[in-house]
């Protein structure tokens, strides 16, 4: 049965896992790491870079590198320009997903077509649909979108499903924060409530350090560095490193030599100490925001901290001591430590993929919608149909009527949010139901139905009960992608994949050619009288032809000239191999061995060189 991936598409890092032998296993990327930086860039030669390679070149190439694109998912008009071309957040996210997919395929040795992808619990409809679009562009059928804290609870509780317990999942990632309250028991994972902030995460803690460094440098040197992209990239890396170091030590030093040049032409260096106490002071308001969300989630679930059986921390930012201390003080419980905060979400997604694929039995996941859904009614009021923290999938209907006599049509304005005034909530979509027969206001009966699927994505319909006329909309949201746009982006992504494949193939052809030239030159040198002058002349001519081809860009020409060189050198290498064999067979004792030592080892080396094994590895 085809494998279904579980993917944690993170703000800072992403992770992919799969079910193998009844267990969820994290798949390492091509570089050998278990997580992949969610960074996309283009090199100065126009080559697409994703992951660690993109992150490494960011300091020298900040204009063509993008971080934290997840923070802009679902934004209508947001674009980033890389290598002279505009990309939507969905397209950038698709590049990350393509990298994860390709690495998983290489690891598993099979083609992957389906995935379960996680999103922050507090992602709205627009952001969820954008995530599905990104999966489609990457060539993945997204079977399910699930919430990150819920996925983490699956990772924690798959082997504890028979124990009734209430757990709090505190998920502080690179760019988003969620807290969810769940009840586990009898194989059922039921989300009772969720709260959070889609623009609060480790990036914000880093930014506080960056702001501090900028202010300190301006104070000491009188230079404003805030407009220099290359410098800001160095500061970003230094701030992230300092944050991580302060999780283990009480103070750290930020030393960045040759950061800029002063008005006197002299280089300026940064050398600033930062203590854990200073760091915690400058970020305490960020932690306070997470406390507000924890209180709200418990209140919505009608629980107190004393009712909790377990507290789970998820996301790399939860390694900060201040986070652990805050959660422990609030809940009165030491957080559960036997779970990797960077991998738990991907593992949970893989378990859900196993449920959908029939590999994992007796597990039922009951998630909730994070925000209230409703429509605008008379006077600009937001009238809710589905309250936040309602278990999904769900379907709710309500009867509305006209606001004026003989009103021929009604506009259904679909909203998401907690405010009582329509304009203060997020618009998900609008559509018109027309053809209503003339009647006094309040007489026509318009049934509005909201239907949320298991991915948390909304479908809305309106029906005139008098005429039976109906209109419906699958919320595509502002900034959503039409099927045609997704199709175009899929083709564009496939085209880039083909370009990447060709570029890689061309590099391999060049590497093979250069390695063969080295091996052939050594073979000629070592052959001695085993090669005729005519044979040597042919090999030398083939070497020159191949070197000339390497000066150009015609890969097929290089390939053909490589094959020609292989053919010309083959008789010589064969003769050398046979000579080496004969010498080995003739060695009958110490004297015989001494007589062949001078030539035998050399011939062995030449033969190995001709196979080009070592040279290819070096390339």
Swiss-Prot record:
Region listing for Disordered, in residue ranges: 580-619
PROSITE patterns: HSP70_1, HSP70_2, HSP70_3
Biased composition (Acidic residues): 604-619
InterPro entries in alphabetical order: ATPase_NBD (IPR043129), Chaperone_DnaK (IPR012725), Heat_shock_70_CS (IPR018181), HSP70_C_sf (IPR029048), HSP70_peptide-bd_sf (IPR029047), Hsp_70_fam (IPR013126)
Keywords, alphabetical: ATP-binding, Chaperone, Nucleotide-binding
Keyword Chaperone carried by entry: yes
Protein name: Chaperone protein DnaK
Organism per entry: Methanosarcina mazei
Biological role stated in the UniProt entry: Acts as a chaperone.
Pfam families, per database record: HSP70 (PF00012)
Similarity-based family: Belongs to the heat shock protein 70 family.
Domain of life: Archaea
One Gene Ontology molecular-function label: ATP binding
CDD domains: ASKHA_NBD_HSP70_DnaK-like
């Amino acid at each position: 049965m085809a494998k279904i991936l579980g993917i944690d598409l993170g703000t800072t890092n992403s992770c992919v896992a799969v079910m193998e032998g009844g267990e969820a296993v994290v798949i390492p990327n091509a570089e050998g790491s278990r997580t992949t930086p969610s960074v996309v860039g283009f090199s100065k030669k126009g080559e697409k870079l994703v992951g660690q390679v993109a992150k490494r070149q960011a300091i020298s190439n900040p204009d063509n590198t993008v971080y934290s694109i997840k923070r802009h998912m679902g934004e209508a008009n947001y674009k980033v320009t890389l290598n002279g071309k505009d990309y939507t957040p969905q397209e950038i996210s698709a590049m990350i997903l393509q990298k994860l997919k390709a690495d998983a395929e290489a690891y598993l040795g099979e083609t992957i077509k389906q995935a379960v992808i996680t999103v922050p619990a507090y992602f709205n409809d627009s952001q969820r649909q954008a995530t599905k679009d990104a999966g489609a562009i990457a060539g993945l059928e997204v079977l399910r979108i699930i919430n990150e804290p819920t996925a983490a609870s699956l990772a924690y509780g798959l082997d504890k499903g028979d124990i009734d317990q209430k757990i709090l999942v505190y998920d502080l990632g690179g760019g988003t924060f969620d807290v969810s309250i769940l009840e586990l028991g009898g194989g059922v994972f039921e989300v009772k409530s969720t709260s959070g902030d889609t623009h609060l995460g480790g990036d914000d803690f880093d930014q506080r350090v960056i702001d501090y460094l900028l202010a300190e440098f301006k104070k000491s040197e009188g230079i404003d560095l805030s407009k220099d992209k290359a410098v800001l990239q160095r500061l970003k890396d230094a701030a992230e490193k300092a944050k991580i170091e302060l999780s283990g030590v009480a103070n750290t030093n930020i030393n960045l030599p040759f950061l800029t040049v002063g008005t006197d032409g002299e280089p300026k260096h940064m050398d600033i100490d930062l203590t854990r106490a200073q760091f915690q002071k400058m970020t305490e308001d960020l932690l306070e925001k997470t406390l507000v969300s924890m209180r709200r989630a418990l209140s919505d679930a009608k629980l107190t901290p004393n009712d909790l059986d377990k507290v789970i921390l998820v996301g790399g930012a939860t390694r900060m001591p201040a986070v652990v201390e805050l959660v422990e003080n609030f809940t009165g419980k030491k957080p559960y430590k036997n779970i990797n905060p960077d991998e738990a979400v991907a593992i949970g997604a893989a378990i859900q993929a196993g449920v959908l694929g029939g590999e994992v039995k007796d597990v039922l996941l009951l998630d909730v919608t994070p925000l209230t859904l409703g429509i605008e009614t008379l006077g600009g009021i937001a009238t809710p149909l589905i309250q936040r923290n309602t278990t999904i999938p769900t379907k709710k209907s309500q009867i509305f009527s006209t606001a004026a006599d003989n009103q021929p049509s009604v506009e259904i304005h679909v909203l998401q949010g907690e405010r009582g005034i329509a304009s203060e909530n997020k618009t998900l979509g609008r559509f018109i139901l027309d053809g209503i027969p003339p009647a006094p206001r309040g007489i026509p009966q318009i049934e509005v139905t909201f239907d949320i699927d298991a991915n948390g994505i909304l479908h809305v319909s309106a029906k005139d009960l008098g005429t039976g006329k109906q209109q419906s909309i699958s919320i595509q949201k502002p900034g959503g992608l039409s099927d045609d746009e997704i199709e175009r982006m899929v083709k564009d992504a496939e085209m880039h994949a083909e370009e990447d494949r060709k570029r890689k193939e061309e590099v391999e052809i060049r590497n093979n050619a250069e390695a063969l030239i080295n091996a052939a030159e050594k073979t000629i040198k070592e052959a001695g009288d085993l090669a005729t002058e005519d044979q040597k002349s042919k090999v030398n001519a083939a070497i020159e032809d191949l070197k000339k081809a390497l000066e150009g860009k015609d890969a097929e020409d290089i390939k053909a000239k490589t094959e020609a060189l292989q053919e010309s050198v083959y008789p010589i290498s064969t003769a050398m191999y046979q000579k080496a064999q004969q010498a080995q067979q003739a060695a009958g004792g110490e004297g015989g061995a001494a007589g062949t030592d001078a030539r035998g080892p050399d011939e062995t080396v030449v033969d190995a060189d001709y196979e080009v094994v070592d040279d290819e590895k070096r390339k």
